[in-house]
Amino acid sequence: MALEALTDLKKVRNIGIMAHIDAGKTTTTERILFYTGINRKVGETHDGASTMDWMEQEKERGITITSAATTCFWNDNQINLIDTPGHVDFTVEVERSLRVLDGAVAVFDAKEGVEPQSEQVWRQADKYDVPRLCFVNKMDKLGADFYHTVQTIIDRLGAKPLVMELPIGAEDDFEGVVDLLQMKALMWPGVVAAGTEPTIEEIPADLQEKAEEYREKLIEAVAESDEELMERYFAGEEITVDEIKKQIRHLTINGEAYPVFCGTAYKNKGIQPILDAIIDYLPNPMDVGSIKGFDPKDREIERNRKPSRDEPFSALAFKVAVHPFFGKLTYVRVYSGSVETGDKIINSTKNKPERVGKLFQMHSNKEQPVDRASAGHIYAFIGLKDTSTGDTLSDSANPVVLEDMDFPDPVIEVAIEPKTKSDQEKLGTAIQKLAEEDPTFTVKLDEETGQTVIGGMGELHLDVLVDRMKREFKVEANVGAPQVAYRETIKKPVEKLEYTHKKQTGGSGQFARVIIALEPLVPEEGSEETYEFIDEVTGGRIPKEYIPSVDQGIQDAMQYGYLAGFPLVNIKATLLDGAYHEVDSSEMAFKLAGSMALKEAVAKAKPVLLEPMMAVEIITPEEYMGEVIGDVNSRRGSVSSMEDRSGAKVVKARVPLSQMFGYVGDLRSKTQGRANYSMIFDSYAEVPQNVAEEIIAERTGK
């Protein structure tokens, strides 16, 4: 079938594959592409030949960093597939992929079950209400345990799994699955080539009883969610397979339950049932319905868009990448209407006109040109100059802004110095392009040292970015040791602080008076907001046009905190009153007054230092448990829980990021290489007084 967008949206699925690093996500994706006829040769991650991993570093490191989008077909249905990274440093990639997906397949390792990263990605999918299927992969692995993995889905994710298949055998003897709907065995005995169809056989005698028990559980779980089915079930009437499937689809799309399948992608067993399930149970764009948006000029006015070609054009840019030949590629999910090459549209987030140069449907990093981009599909646009991740594109005559995406602040920074003058220029270009692609990559100039400081979500994240500067932009640079991204905040409210900015030199002077109040801001659950500004000025004592300048002045001053020059967060500023002068007042005067008022108020508000705390999970053999816990305590960490997992001990702790540099080597030497760990950013916490004094002294030289 030609790679063109299907007009019948009921036959379209926009899905992603999400998982913990090493759960076999990229291999699962590769198999899907092979089975749907896109790939003629199967790429393996450990050979560095995987199709979806198309950046040099991904091939080298055997991990997926960027989410490439691919279109493929299965039984006359079109699947637009987005590959997402499983490494914690790349959560922003996962977040922006989930934002534009209609459904996802969560891949779990049959031995490990739900791991910390799977849990984090699952919660991100909850945030965007993404319906999911579960695929328990690596059933051929030593220690694989399907039933344990299903239990971890219940215990750790609080989710309701619907077991659709039972494994036949495990580890080296994994040969197939029992299809609990059809009550047949799908067998792939021995070593099978990619694409091998299963033989359909009777259920092995030793599994018959278990299969009947699990089928009964499945039908009961499905029936209890529908009154009519429940009555028929208790009356002993037969419920047809089609009726069960229809209700499973309903439960899955509503996020009430999650169908669970199993197999081994690497050994080519269990892939076809997952493809069938994507079509049977995950939603099409019509099921998802209208997308919420608002009027760019007035956010109070709602503007919703239906997934139809007849509606005005609206789309969300969810990824920007630099292509070696075409330059800037913008990945876009089209929600309504359509657009053709050459059309003029508007970036309604930034209120800037854009022109569509070329349009492609992507197969990993190979492009298939198309003339039109239409509702319900994912495309790569070329020629968009001002569009970055999270921006809305819409019809110029009917602008709309779709919901924004939230991105976390960086937790780790490094100073980077170009080696030569020409590297200085190249570094500027590289930083600008990489920042366009990745909203969690930040750049700032350290005013004290004059160095360029780049920030990101972890050591691997920054390694990859620096590596890309060298490879793609030929920048030679010295990179400093990683620094923790500390923050400052206040603990005490300041009810009233008055500041007057006044300058009188020949001609017109400068005048602005502001009275502000400050208080600590407690961010709402799940919100990335760390600042709030409230205007309580009455009677025109400060003209309306100057109030945004006060706000801007306060925000500018928050970039450099009082204690050690770290950014200020979690502050609520209220502009109470002020005064102006007909001639001498200006936006600049009020901006300066806002900045100085904040600085003086913070000094009185009991400022403190904050540091990023990491949620660390360590898996260790029992005999090293004491060493591991002692080490966590010596790093100012606190152990929150301990549990058993497949013969090992799991220690969960909160540890300051500053104490985790070089931890991997220390852990290996303490446990003879038998323990491993993972960590994700948890929250910011106050630094103990004695440690804070050291940090401030080192930073300020006092």
From Swiss-Prot:
Gene Ontology annotations of biological process type: ribosome disassembly
Gene3D superfamilies the UniProt entry points to: 3.30.230.10, 3.30.70.240, Elongation Factor G (Translational Gtpase), domain 3, P-loop containing nucleotide triphosphate hydrolases, Translation factors
Organism superkingdom: Bacteria
InterPro entries: EFG_II (IPR041095), EFG_III (IPR009022), EFG_III/V (IPR035647), EFG_IV (IPR047872), EFG_V (IPR035649), EFG_V-like (IPR000640), EFTu-like_2 (IPR004161), G_TR_CS (IPR031157)
Keyword Phosphoprotein part of the UniProt annotation: no
Record GO cellular component, one term: cytoplasm
Compartments (UniProt record): Cytoplasm
Function: Catalyzes the GTP-dependent ribosomal translocation step during translation elongation. During this step, the ribosome changes from the pre-translocational (PRE) to the post-translocational (POST) state as the newly formed A-site-bound peptidyl-tRNA and P-site-bound deacylated tRNA move to the P and E sites, respectively. Catalyzes the coordinated movement of the two tRNA molecules, the mRNA and conformational changes in the ribosome.
HAMAP family according to UniProt: EF_G_EF_2_B
Record protein name field: Elongation factor G
